[in-house]
Amino acid sequence: MKTSELRQKFLKFFETKGHTVVRSSSLVPHDDPTLLFTNAGMNQFKDVFLGFDKRPYSRATTAQKCVRAGGKHNDLENVGYTARHHTFFEMMGNFSFGDYFKRDAIHFAWEFLTSPEWLNIPKDKLLATVYAEDDEAYNIWLNEIGMPSERIVRIGDNKGAKYASDNFWQMGDTGPCGPCSEIFYDHGEEIWGGIPGSPEEDGDRWIEIWNCVFMQFNRDEQGNMNPLPKPSVDTGMGLERMAAVMQHVHSNYEIDLFQDLLKAVARETGAAFSMEEPSLKVIADHIRSCSFLIADGVLPSNEGRGYVLRRIIRRAVRHGYKLGQSKPFFHKLVADLVKEMGDAYPELKEKQVQIEEALKNEESRFAQTLETGMALLENALAKGSKKLDGEIIFKLYDTYGFPYDLTADICRERNIELDEAGFEREMEAQRARARAAQSFKANAQLPYDGQDTEFKGYSERQTESKVLALYKDGEQVDELNEGDSGAVVIDFTPFYAESGGQVGDVGYIFSGENRFEVRDTQKIKAAVFGQFGVQTSGRLKVGDSVTAKVDDEIRNANMRNHSATHLMHKALRDVLGRHVEQKGSLVTAESTRFDISHPQAVTAEEIAEVERRVNEAVLANVAVNAAIMSMEDAQKTGAMMLFGEKYGDEVRVLQMGGFSTELCGGTHVSRTGDIGLFKIISEGGIAAGVRRIEAITGLNALKWAQEQERLVKDIIAETKAQTEKDVLAKIQAGAAHAKALEKELARAKAELAVHAGAKLLDDAKDLGAAKLVAAQIEADAAALREIVTDLTGKSDNAVILLAAVNDGKVSLCAGVSKALTGKVKAGDLVKFAAEQVGGKGGGRPDLAQAGGTDAGKLPAVLDSVKDWVGAKLV
């Protein structure tokens, strides 16, 4: 049975049992700061289990994409070296939200595994474990399923505390928890290992294939186990493990999906295909996690999820290097993965080009430092120490881009221990430097437990309100006096709180002579807005009746830029391709800054086309309408949504005629014509695969255009051109003339250098076996090299060291006639001189260059060369 067939069978089985098939959630969890990546099927249902969310179904089944990698201590280093470790895997699951419980969960699992209609696994190949105190589950296995008692294993509290057991699941220190029952498959007595709970349980004979978690209790802060009113079920079955069972193989890497990927890896690296080669397995595993992460919006970076992705990519590239492939190859495997898994996960097909570009860019970036870093590491390992120094590990990490676990991987192959403590010291020193250099924005999270704020700002710019709370220095106070900086919470507010990339509104809150200047608006809680600013006159007290008024000019500018951003987003997708996704935005009164996923620079022609499309929509002057509707209705409108974002049951849909439909909670113009004019003023890369575009609107765009016009007129006047069309020709002619003069100057310098060099050789010091020239001249580094090469070519026994000082920096060049390189080496000579002037360098035995920073020591260094060379000639 192929892996793809097994996936479909599982979902079909549970669909026949009344379960709703729910598509896999993104690998990037939303609204769950406790998770780096989705790592289990239940992640997307966490709020349902906790009672915070309700679904229109009580039974669900999924094939969930999962990634388990992240943090220095993880299983990444084991991937490729064991039969079942992966960075990416699929978790098949069935879930009950207060519907069925233990009996049905166990019966469903048993039927799917053993029924001839489904998997038809021999019953005597299976074993079940239960929590020691879970008599209910034990009796279901024994009396209803008919499993022999010797193949039902009770597992107690084997982790040192009450309820701390392999067979007792807990979401956290408090909250839903309960016993679980695991199903194991026997790979055969020829494989070493014992049943769960035995001394040999870590062997590979008995492998867990399914875990059924019974959420039965709610653990309170005192540790009491209180029965849940509606117990639930969460199960998980690893697809790759189950495929190995169904295909009668022992290792996950032997299943059909991996066999095809392994052959592709061998093809692209030029390595011989062998199931004994860990590097092939590493790369085959890593192309899955990397491709799926990029498809779900993660891009390589130096922090968070992006850094985990970077680590995985670089580990794969290093293993390719180990197999002898030094050119970019990893991205070429994406097509093979799409062929294997694209039907089950259409996002792979949709994002194939983007995935390939992101991987190729990261490969190329790492290739620039991989060889140099490997040379440094090999040199350190060649010293024979059994432990790699922490400073070297840090240098590899900081300078050459070697993640810690990549270095650990290499050292593991050589049985070399890592100086982890030394590495941590270097890392902490770097973090301390970063903390000292960084300033932080004040935190808007203030203590508040009063009523929510009602936002009136979509339709009103001014409200009559009541002061609910006041803050000064982060603490609640009863009043703010003149000169006090703080925050105000009012019951009705026209001020938009920073959200969705749009900055918070500014304006005033006042009553009579009492005036508070609002300089920013932030959310203190989800539905509580804080107006931050300063009391410019009088006094403000809790309970005061006040007028809150938004600054119209700034609000209007914010609205123009925000509405223009929507039009630009749509135009970018139409012009550049459907792969374009929003990666970030900042809407202010001055401009809009928009970050998008795109593998290369946006061309001038593409920018012009985007501008044309946006301004066409502006000139159409269509109405901008907002409507609150259900998510289902919003999807029917074709509204653009942020990929992977989590939305509520009701959403706000913003429509601009036929030009743009998008979910948005921001403030916008009434008609597109209010934008006035749209102009992109900059475009550039901010990370691998991410471009940043900045644009302006309205009078700001007009002002920019007028400044450009003035600049062009100044250039026309300066170049004495007759018209704008003549300017370019004038500039090109001037540049050509300057280039010709530079060539003429270079020829003159070269001639002078040759003449100067001849005189230097005439004045050389005779050391018997050699003629020594050690002098400072006026020349650049290129001229120094040319002179030294010329002099050594004219003599069969010359030792030359020439120096020059340009902009306070020392340039050195040494040359030795080939007949003398057995005794005197140019690389050694230039290194000797460079170290004394605060620099370093080296090169070939006959020619070498270096630099330095201490020009004051140069005369003494040149004087010392005679003794140094003389000693070498003895």
Swiss-Prot record:
Compartments, as annotated in UniProt: Cytoplasm
Role of this protein: Catalyzes the attachment of alanine to tRNA(Ala) in a two-step reaction: alanine is first activated by ATP to form Ala-AMP and then transferred to the acceptor end of tRNA(Ala). Also edits incorrectly charged Ser-tRNA(Ala) and Gly-tRNA(Ala) via its editing domain.
Residues bound to Zn(2+): 562, 566, 664, 668
Required cofactor(s): Zn(2+)
Family: Belongs to the class-II aminoacyl-tRNA synthetase family.
One of the record's GO molecular function terms: tRNA binding
Major subcellular location class: cytoplasm
Keyword Nucleotide-binding set for record: yes
Cofactor notes: Binds 1 zinc ion per subunit.
Enzymatic class: ligase
Domain of life: Bacteria
Protein's name according to its UniProt entry: Alanine--tRNA ligase
Domain notes: Consists of three domains; the N-terminal catalytic domain, the editing domain and the C-terminal C-Ala domain. The editing domain removes incorrectly charged amino acids, while the C-Ala domain, along with tRNA(Ala), serves as a bridge to cooperatively bring together the editing and aminoacylation centers thus stimulating deacylation of misacylated tRNAs.
Catalytic activity: tRNA(Ala) + L-alanine + ATP = L-alanyl-tRNA(Ala) + AMP + diphosphate
CDD domains: AlaRS_core
